[in-house]
Amino acid sequence: AYNALAPKGAPNSCEWEQEEPTQEMAGELEDEEEAEEEEAEEEAEAPQAGQKVKKTHVYAQAPLAGEKITANGLQIVSDTQTEGNPVFADPTYQPEPQVGESQWNEAEATAIGGRVLKKTTPMKPCYGSYARPTNKNGGQGILVANNQGALESKVEMQFFAPSGTAMNERNAVQPSIVLYSEDVNMETPDTHISYKPSKTDENSKAMLGQQAMPNRPNYIAFRDNFIGLMYYNSTGNMGVLAGQASQLNAVVDLQDRNTELSYQLLLDSIGDRTRYFSMWNQAVDSYDPDVRIIENHGTEDELPNYCFPLGGIGVTDTYQGIKSNGNGNPQNWTKNDDFAARNEIGVGNNFALEINLNANLWRNFLYSNIALYLPDKLKYTPTNVEISPNPNSYDYMNKRVVAPGLVDCYINLGARWSLDYMENVNPFNHHRNAGLRYRSMLLGNGRYVPFHIQVPQKFFAIKNLLL
């Protein structure tokens, strides 16, 4: 279950590598020619001015305020509560990404913690992302064997200070944010990509803008021809094997569809039809109430509502990565050149805007229950999205999309109007038939099978015998 109001294009807190020119001025190249041999050797080992080096970029949300940040991480309980024994976040699962400020007007915090996915975890939209827990506290870091052979999550702490402070070495640089970075088993079992900025799957700044949409219900698309019988009957209106009913070896003619349907509807009105669904795997045609009067059998969650900032993070500040000098003095921090100079990190809770939920729900309802079941000629393949070439496959049908403006021509002015396609296009109206829909759920993963007119299953053996 996902937040239906979440922006479909928001990324997870993530990292990526990007080539950048070094910071040295180009004029320094002339001085290198006159430098001593030792200095020249040092310069040869370091990146030359104008050369491009790969640096890590960060886009993340740090929601949890703590007491202070040291080389041990984020202190989450005050000294007064622990009588001088500081308690730091457990890197295997803290700070928990869903825990933040309890109210919108919290005072400004100076020590903030959060979690971020390493650049080695593939970027996916936050909507639909899932990573299975790997420890009893719900932490999701991938477990790696340590020197003793025990499995543990490889969580690394990354420290950040405002760029304006960290760029000047003469300042007393102090971390204001610590991000706990980890690799997770990233999956998207219930969604698929609907917009992809690039054909490559590599982590990059452009890939922050991916968008996802939910997988549609996986129904099989063929019309009912009374394959099998819903009710056991004593030969009054249908042909059956004599041994099962009247003990006479006689076969009567199969009634036409209208006679059969009338009998099914009669039984439906006087008994509990549902008990026979699984037994006989059969449908009664419910076209009129379920097609003309639309019920919801879609996910109702395909279109964005834009309740939150599109990036899912909102207002960010620019931070520079820093690192401890390693001499044990918590006051000694210096710039970390492995990170880019500008890392965008949001602090605290997200901003949110109120919208017309009823209007959005109605539009989503129409998109889920009408647009996604329209003929393929009205659909298109999203740019850069890999899709099966087989138009009868679930992958193809699931990933093709319709222009959302199409459902805006549906009219609802106190009466039941519908698009022409809703009335006369099959398999669009297949999933509106209660019995067909249920049978499709029973039969499984495929969405399309070729079919022909068939007689009830009990007659297959007789038909063969007569031949």
From Swiss-Prot:
Region (Disordered): 1-54
GO cellular component: host cell; host cell nucleus; T=25 icosahedral viral capsid
GO biological process, one term: symbiont entry into host cell
Subcellular location: Virion; Host nucleus
Acidic residues compositional bias, start-end: 16-45
Keyword NAD belongs to the record: no
SUPFAM superfamilies the record matches: Group II dsDNA viruses VP
Pfam families: Adeno_hexon
Keyword Mitochondrion among record annotations: no
Induction description: Expressed in the late phase of the viral replicative cycle.
Main location: virion
Keywords of the record: Capsid protein, Cytoplasmic inwards viral transport, Host nucleus, Host-virus interaction, Late protein, Microtubular inwards viral transport, T=25 icosahedral capsid protein, Virion, Virus entry into host cell
Note: All late proteins expressed from the major late promoter are produced by alternative splicing and alternative polyadenylation of the same gene giving rise to non-overlapping ORFs. A leader sequence is present in the N-terminus of all these mRNAs and is recognized by the viral shutoff protein to provide expression although conventional translation via ribosome scanning from the cap has been shut off in the host cell.
Self-association and partners: Homotrimer. Interacts with the capsid vertex protein; this interaction binds the peripentonal hexons to the neighboring penton base. Interacts with the hexon-linking protein; this interaction tethers the hexons surrounding the penton to those situated in the central plate of the facet. Interacts with the hexon-interlacing protein; this interaction lashes the hexons together. Interacts with host dyneins DYNC1LI1 and DYNC1I2; this interaction might be involved in intracellular microtubule-dependent transport of incoming viral capsid.
Chain's role: Major capsid protein that self-associates to form 240 hexon trimers, each in the shape of a hexagon, building most of the pseudo T=25 capsid. Assembled into trimeric units with the help of the chaperone shutoff protein. Transported by pre-protein VI to the nucleus where it associates with other structural proteins to form an empty capsid. Might be involved, through its interaction with host dyneins, in the intracellular microtubule-dependent transport of incoming viral capsid to the nucleus.
Family: Belongs to the adenoviridae hexon protein family.
Name of the protein in its database record: Hexon protein
Organism: Human adenovirus C serotype 1
